[in-house]
Amino acid sequence: MSVGPLDPGVAPARLVAMSVDVRSAILIDPAGGLVSASDGDSERARRLAGLAHEMVSAADSAWSGASDALEAQTLGGAIFAVRDARYTLACVARRLALPALVVYDLRQTMLAIGGSAGGAQPGRPGKERSAIREERSPI
């Protein structure tokens, strides 16, 4: 019995269900349009989609070539994104989440929906990017 690809409409909810560290997730198209979200709050999902698209666009501007996996850390948590030519799957995770595990879960979810689990441009190897933002305590 073969199992078909995962419906993109449920991919973010599946990611949140399978990863204890992931708080919220969204799936967007290359233009930043919201495809689906784990959160029932549509305004929050649209905001997260816009921010994820901005993060991916900023990474593309900062480095030559497209990145297939991104990570940004703050004191309050982290945002991760994995993309291919069709979708970007992004999530917000708790602060102490292990990045390699979160990226693994993102890639597995992308594979389940029929994505390439990385490789922003078909036929080109992807690159992972990490930007860590340090915040200093005023004390």
Regions found by a protein language model. Give the residues of each.
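Acidic, low-complexity cytosolic segments
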Residues: 1-24, 30-139
